[in-house]
Amino acid sequence: MTEGGMITLNIDGVDIKARQGQTILEAARSARFYIPSLCYYPGLKPLPQVIPDEACQLCVVEAKDNTVANGNVVLSCVTPVSERMVVNTGTPRIREIQRKNLLAILVRQPTDICFEKRNCELQKVIDYVGLKEIPVHVPRSLPSSTDNPFFVRDSSFCILCNRCLRVCDEIRGLGVIEPAFPCHKACPAGIDIPRYIRLIARGRPNAALAVIRENVPFPGVLGRVCAAPCEDDCRRGQDVDRAIRIRMLKRFPADYGDDSWKKQAKTLPSTGKSIAIVGAGPAGLTCAYYLAKLGHKTTVFEALPEPGGMMRVGIPEYRLPRDILRSEIQEIEKTGVEIRLNARVGSLDSLFEQGYQAIFLAIGAHEEMKLGVEGEDSPGVIRCVEFLRRFNLGEKVEIGNRVGVIGGGNVAIDSARAALRLGAERVSIFYRRTQKEMPAQSEEVEQALEEGVEIVFLVAPSRVYSENHNLELELVRMELGEPDASGRRRPVPIKGTEFIAGLDTLIAAIGERPDIPAGFQLEVGPGNALKVNQDLSTSREGVFAGGDCESGPALVINAVAAGRKAAQSIDRYLGGKGDITEHLVAAEEATTWLEDVPTGGSLATISYLAPQARIKGLSEVEQGINWETAVPEAQR
């Protein structure tokens, strides 16, 4: 019976008293029963904003009462206690669920800290639930800081737990101003995101543009096509409601700002040193830009008739208008960078013979992966890189009415949407996993569906037939099995489920890898990527490499970051300090007080062209945001 607001329940065979309104977790803790939980762990939703799919889900228990079915599994942090409730916290079923849910959290952890060194924040929970190892661990590839002679800081190991700050403060008595903002830390190029958002909130887009340009020469490009890893780590999205639209706020000053940032921009006197850069993509052009500002003579060799690399021939104009890309490349050229087009480089010896003291290779990853099925070289089958290059250069491409695309990444989505704009009546993407596992950006997938692209999930190609100009693609249905090396569940064919799709053109978009000319005489590693040292130097003296040719296919912002790092390393190699730091706007006073953070504020509304209008041409689909929406969004 309920007495004085107290009720009786049973936890693991022991009767305890609890107050009405308490959760099972609160009641258990009051009675000194341990139920693992990570309510306030970085990256997980804290109470009371907890959403089951976004919480740690480690505090699961089996509960039984008049409202909960016999033995039903519930989250103890949100389930209230009731009279005569029976709770079990450690059954085999509960332990298995806890191990599975803990794995989902640990996949972001550095493996050697938790399981080899057995020294991490989650060690007690790991031991308690009986987790022995992470079957598939996907390490992050973030830069290490080697500038300090006393320690090496590897950002790949950082989970923003603030443990290092507590140790310095509590044990060594060394305080810090504050930990790095997660969004700032997540930006590969190190753009000061909180600062430019603060400036936009104050109605200063010119200053915001200057802050962005302190780290990247492509604000307009990145404001449109950056995958925005910073938004995944946005503190507001993790702790309050929804992430700030960081990418769109980057585009706003690029669209509305002026050239006042140039007043503080400086180019150092000539050093008399010459550098050759092979590839005019984001990595090569970024490297050239910063080396030129350091006073070096920089020449970029580009095999294509247009500069920009995959920004020019890989990303369609409806996502990245040509005038935006062209204007930002022209700004790079104004620093003294020379770009030679239709200039393919097959040997590095010839460049050294021309007097270049250093070479930076930024040749991308353009060799396309094979489907590995019979008939994939049949007429009517085209590789995605070739297809997009021809489409984006305005060449004539005959594709017919029925087009199929194999793949689930951004390149597959771009290929499908480009096919619609070439007049295809039916475009189908065939992907071997579900939409949840698609690596393509979610907004790109949504826009493709709006435009009429069909996506068929859980299917994979098994054979291609081509006869009398008729193309048939045999597909087999799949089911998801155990996780593979990417951390995603491996698709497994279902026997006897083969079916045929009739097509006019099949576009293969399952991935690319670097194509390294033999004449370069350089060591390569897994995936045919160039092997480099920490400073991006290769196995050959004076030769550096970065971007997709070193990392494999990655984001534009990663390539820009590689270009920055290469410029620093090459300058040091040539006797400089490697300092590419710029201060294009005076420091402003930051807010030093804490305010209540309102929840539920609406996200900035982004306008798009109507789907039927999109596919009739190459007009930009995403229209950006204006003053009326940018400032309130920045103020969230």
PLM feature spans:
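Glycine-rich Rossmann-fold phosphate-binding loop(s) that bind the pyrophosphate
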Residues: 279-282, 408-409, 548
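Rossmann-like dinucleotide-binding cores of NAD(P)H-dependent redox enzymes
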Residues: 297-340, 391, 416-463, 578-593
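Mid-to-C-terminal Rossmann-like scaffold of FAD/NAD(P)H-dependent oxidoreductases
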Residues: 446-452, 460-467, 471, 479-481, ...
